From Swiss-Prot:
Substrate binds at G65, W162, N215, R407. Belongs to the class-I pyridoxal-phosphate-dependent aminotransferase family. Its EC number is 2.6.1.1, 2.6.1.7. One of its GO terms (molecular function) is kynurenine-oxoglutarate transaminase activity. It catalyses: L-aspartate + 2-oxoglutarate = oxaloacetate + L-glutamate; L-kynurenine + 2-oxoglutarate = kynurenate + L-glutamate + H2O. The modification N6-succinyllysine is found at K73, K90, K107, K122, K159, K185, K227, K296, K309, K338, K363, K396, K404. The modification Phosphotyrosine is found at Y96. One of its GO terms (cellular component) is plasma membrane. The modification N6-(pyridoxal phosphate)lysine is found at K279. InterPro entries: Aminotransferase_I/II_large, Asp_trans, NHTrfase_class1_PyrdxlP-BS, PyrdxlP-dep_Trfase, PyrdxlP-dep_Trfase_major, PyrdxlP-dep_Trfase_small. It is found in: Mitochondrion matrix; Cell membrane. It comes from Macaca fascicularis. This is Aspartate aminotransferase, mitochondrial.
Length: 430
């Protein structure tokens, strides 16, 4: 203590004789980041924080984009637990993965998306790399476009689109444009507006498409509408960039959910594709995803793969191991794959059932509004058509939390609270 005290005295004497030293130290301590402003809170995380502070026993969080069981609890798929047990029993090492990820995972992901009998797979004219979930796949794809897509910097997003699409592409150096997608009057797909806008997009531009379970609206084109969109894309020579975060989770059928992607490829449109296993395997925190580029031939695919690895290396060197092992085990083990497909269908069916129950309960409440769009929409999210002031009332009067645009996560609705939700919605809309 004596030494510490004497040290302080000496430093104080030094500062007295050399006041510039104290001023310099003070400047160094406070001047580097004074210009940095407080960033805005994430709108969805903000909903969750407000929900946590609420003490109402009937409170509902319909903002979170994660599946919940019918008790409102996080759900780990039994097939995932089995895969984890099998992996643990093998006593595997924890060595780095290659830059492109776990080979057996990448192969299985491409097969899941494109179909096991895909001509693209048989000819080898594709490359798939493992990514840090769907967000990582989008960023890798966006960075590849920024570096090698020499025709345009414009990426056309549906209006609306997932909130993270804009910063991902913007931060990669691309420019964002939009095309009509959602019709607020019908709470459905604005097919006429979408086709009209896409047909006017400058040739050799990038068009982002949600493969299934459009986020945030839950509104998807029908197969015949997808066909017409593909025709326009081919005619305008647009590059189709697919985001497929919900394969299997939308309809309960993985092949049905991948129909649009496969149709585009069958029409001779070489696409790129982002996949995520957060929703359909419940591997949210494992960050498991894939990015696939369909190429002209196998030689082009090899060159694209080499450049994707060059992009990945300075970003994160190589992807995480554990989640990819789990996904690969499920996709490549017949009994686990069969079980997983049944579980995915079970999750999708529960969400479809909650949509039906919500509409039924709204009718029981005496609501005269047309709520058919709730059952017409698909996937985890539903655009209710509620106005911001109605959303505010739901929060203040009923402790029901959602984003201001009226989007709800149907996964947060259970057989135990759907009646309360219907009552609250009726009260703010009657």
């Amino acid at each position: 203590m004596a030494l510490l005290h004497s040290g302080r005295v000496l430093s104080g004497i030094a500062a007295a004789f050399h006041p510039g030293l104290a001023a310099a130290a003070s400047a160094r301590a406070s001047s580097w980041w004074t210009h940095v402003e407080m960033g805005p809170p994430d709108p969805i995380l903000g909903v969750t924080e407000a929900f946590k502070r609420d003490t109402n026993s009937k409170k509902m969080n319909l903002g979170v984009g994660a599946y919940r069981d019918d008790n409102g609890k996080p759900y780990v798929l039994p097939s995932v637990r089995k895969a984890e047990a099998q992996i643990a029993a093998k006593n595997l090492d924890k060595e780095y993965l290659p830059i492109g990820g776990l080979a057996e995972f990448c192969k299985a992901s491409a097969e899941l998306a494109l179909g096991e009998n895909s001509e693209v797979l048989k000819s080898g004219r594709f490359v798939t790399v493992q990514t840090i979930s769907g967000t990582g796949a989008l960023r890798i794809g966006a960075s590849f476009l920024q570096r090698f897509f020499k025709f345009s910097r414009d990426v056309f997003l549906p209006k609306p689109s997932w909130g993270n699409h804009t910063p991902i592409f913007r931060d990669a150096g691309m420019q964002l444009q939009g095309y009509r997608y959602y019709d607020p009057k019908t709470c459905g797909f604005d097919f006429t507006g979408a086709v009209e806008d896409i047909s006017k997009i400058p040739e050799q531009s990038v068009l982002l498409l949600h493969a299934c379970a459009h986020n945030p609206t839950g509104v998807d084109p029908r197969p015949e509408q997808w066909k017409e969109i593909a025709t326009v894309v081919k005619k305008r020579n647009l590059f189709a960039f697919f985001d497929m975060a919900y394969q299997g989770f939308a309809s309960g059928d993985g092949d049905k959910d991948a129909w649009a992607v496969r149709h585009f490829i069958e029409q001779g449109i070489n696409v790129c594709l982002c996949q995520s296993y957060a929703k359909n395997m419940g591997l949210y925190g494992e960050r498991v995803g894939a990015f696939t580029m369909v190429c002209k031939d196998a030689d082009e695919a090899k060159r694209v793969e080499s450049q994707l690895k060059i992009l990945i290396r300075p970003m994160y060197s190589n992807p995480p191991l554990n989640g990819a092992r789990i996904a690969a085990a499920i996709l490549n083990t017949p009994d686990l794959r069969k079980q997983w497909l049944q579980e995915v269908k079970g999750m999708a069916d529960r969400i479809i059932g909650m949509r039906t129950q919500l509409v039924s309960n709204l009718k029981k409440e005496g609501s005269t509004h047309n709520w058919q769009h709730i059952t017409d929409q698909i996937g985890m999210f539903c655009f209710t058509g509620l106005k911001p002031e109605q959303v505010e009332r739901l929060t203040k009067e009923f402790s029901i939390y959602m984003t201001k645009d009226g989007r709800i996560s149907v996964a947060g609705v259970t057989s135990g609270n759907v009646g309360y939700l219907a009552h609250a919605i009726h009260q703010v809309t009657k």
